[in-house]
């Protein structure tokens, strides 16, 4: 067996033993959960390993606990906090919480259940040792708290929240559980989570991290993926710069990158399908589509107010209605050997003089065909590559 001995500094005679469960004997990082520590105390941890031959004890590591709060009963968080309700900026909580406790936590974060402001300033919360119980309303949507679930609206509108570690036994994160948490940068997801839906309005969110022990999800570069790594579950809106889709991806779902902050996308030839509105209202400036994509779906780049350059894949066959509506394209590159079919409103655009300001780039020898086309011929400037 392996684990560590835990004791208060200066009191090694009172040490307790914490054992790693289901230890397989392999080398590498090992995670060990240690509970029931005193607040604001000085501890030492001594790693050990034991077999039939004997025991090896490593050098002690010192650790200072913080002002963690432990609940013995549901509904008592408000009482425990007392006059200190609005003083915390960082907090760890242990115990069982219901809707009443979560509502108190919202107050500490600066919002009540009607989204009215409070003096709270809590921004960093660790709920690892929390068990979520059913009962009691929480959040501006007034949903009832549920067992092991972060229900819709639980933290909605908590603009001061920057970082949250979810309960170790939480199984569900409902849609918009963190809606409009505009300062939230990171969410840590436990191994137990099996159902996750994204939240809108998390404009600063840069990373969703997942326990390596989670069998349903994984995180890559801060992006939440399914376990197979070929589908985006939640793309953080605050992630910036360039993004190259992992080669395992074969499709991008509807609205997958809606409102995201990535400025340049590169899609491999493995991507075969794009969902409707996949990049709608995003901050994208440039995108390179791979040869695997044949259909440009409805509204895929609608509302992309910074999008100026689009490179269509070599096998593009069809462009659907309103694909670029509201996008101020300056250059559209078409490399297909056959002229793609366009629906009647494929290039309908709120941008004034779209056909005059966007340069259409076509393969060598095909300029005349595009100029004589009913829809493609509307472009004032057509150049051969």
Report residues per predicted region.
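Short, surface-exposed linear motifs at loops/turns and structural transition points
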Residues: 1-66
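Structural signature of tandem-repeat unit edges
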Residues: 67-72, 89-97, 114-149, 158-172, ...
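Acidic Gly/Asp/Thr-rich repetitive segments characteristic of extracellular carbohydrate-active
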Residues: 68-88, 106
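A short acidic, amphipathic alpha-helical/loop segment
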Residues: 80, 101-108, 345-346
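Helix-loop-beta element that forms the nucleotide-linked donor phosphate-binding surface
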Residues: 373-378
């Amino acid at each position: 067996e392996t684990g560590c001995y835990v004791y208060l500094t200066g009191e090694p005679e009172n040490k307790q033993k914490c054992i790693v469960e289901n230890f397989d004997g392999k080398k590498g990082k090992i995670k060990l959960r240690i509970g029931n520590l005193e607040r604001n105390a000085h501890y030492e941890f001594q790693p050990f390993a034991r077999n039939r031959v004997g025991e090896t004890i490593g050098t002690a590591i010192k650790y200072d606990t913080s002002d963690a709060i432990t609940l013995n009963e549901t509904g008592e968080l408000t009482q425990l906090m007392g006059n200190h309700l609005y003083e915390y900026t960082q907090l760890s909580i242990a115990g069982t919480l219901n809707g009443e406790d979560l509502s108190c936590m919202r107050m500490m974060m600066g919002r009540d259940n009607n989204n009215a402001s409070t003096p709270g300033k809590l921004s960093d919360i660790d709920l690892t040792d929390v068990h979520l119980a059913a009962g009691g309303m929480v959040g501006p949507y007034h949903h009832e708290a549920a067992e092991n679930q972060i229900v819709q609206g639980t933290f909605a509108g908590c603009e001061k929240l920057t970082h949250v570690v979810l309960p170790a036994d939480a199984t569900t994160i409902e849609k918009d559980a963190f809606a409009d948490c505009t300062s939230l940068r990171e969410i840590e997801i436990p191994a137990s989570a099996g159902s996750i839906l994204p939240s809108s309005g998390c404009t600063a969110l840069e990373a969703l991290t997942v326990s390596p022990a989670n069998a349903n999800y994984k995180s890559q570069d801060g992006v939440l993926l399914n376990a197979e790594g070929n589908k985006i579950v939640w793309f953080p809106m605050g992630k910036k710069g360039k993004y190259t889709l992992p080669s395992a991806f074969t499709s991008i779902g509807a609205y997958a990158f809606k409102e995201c902050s990535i400025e340049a996308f590169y899609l491999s030839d493995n991507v075969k399908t794009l969902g409707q509105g996949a990049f709608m209202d995003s901050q994208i400036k440039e995108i390179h589509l791979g040869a695997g994509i044949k259909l440009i779906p409805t509204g895929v780049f609608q509302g992309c107010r910074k999008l100026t350059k689009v490179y269509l894949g070599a096998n593009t066959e069809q462009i659907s209605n309103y694909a670029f509506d509201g996008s101020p394209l300056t250059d559209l590159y078409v490399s297909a050997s056959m002229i793609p079919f366009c629906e009647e409103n494929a290039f309908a655009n709120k941008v004034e003089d779209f056909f005059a300001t966007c340069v259409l780039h076509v393969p060598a020898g095909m300029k005349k065909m595009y100029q004589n086309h009913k829809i493609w011929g509307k472009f004032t400037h057509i150049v051969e590559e």
